[in-house]
Amino acid sequence: MHAATADDNRLLHSIPAARVALIERIVRSAATGGGRQGLAQRFLRSYFHGVAEEDLAAREPRGLSRAALAHLKFAAQRPGQHPLVRVFNPQAERDGFESPHTLVLTVSDDMPFLVDSIGMAFARANLAVHLIVHPVLQVHRDRRGRLLDLGANGGGPARAESWQLYEIDRVTDPQELEKLQRDLEATLGDVRVAVHDWRAMRERVRAVIDSLAKDPPALLPAEINEVAHLLEWMDEGDRKSVV
């Protein structure tokens, strides 16, 4: 197994020792081999960094590493900025592991509202969520969207991507699996449009606030202050809703 890098150590020092031990069990279980083993191990440490100890301890390390590496393989090619969605029931002969649950993998630009929006899609389908893994990774891709490296120091500009894994109630009907995938793809597309519009609206609100201070209209100062305070309150509420 490759030794943890300096970046890995900084990452692991920010979480409880019990979680570090569980993550290292997952890393040891991977045994990917080949020239990209170091990348896979760095990926696993980042991937499970934010997962609670009880969720990690309740599952076999090999199953977790296989699911994560399936995510890494799935994300190897991402043309443009299009989100990726995969909904499947793991099979030992195809995926190298099995699960009593249906798995959902997504890869998208990091944006507000992602987890909540996907959660609502599951609620609409009456599907319970049993595990969420949702790291934000610094990703290096070439012009064709091919994954080159992970980490802020991978060389060249990195892009923040949200990689999400969900274990949900098992769905066995192939048509229902396809329907869920289409719904999730549409959901991620809607989030992208909403975030773009939301940012544009926030910029407009800030511009109006600035104009009230620099070039106030022909109103009483108290009225101007009331409008400015209202806009500041709206802007602050929008900001807090995505923190």
Name each region found by the language model.
Residues 126-140:
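Glycine-rich phosphate/pyrophosphate-binding loops
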Residues 106-114, 118-123:
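Extended amphipathic alpha-helical scaffold segments
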Residues 142, 146-195:
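Internal insertion modules embedded within essential enzymes
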Residues 101-108, 163-169:
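Short glycine-rich or small-residue beta-strand-to-loop segments that form or flank ligand, phosphate
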Residues 87-94, 118, 145-156:
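Catalytic micro-motifs at enzyme active sites that drive phosphoryl/nucleotidyl and oxygen chemistry
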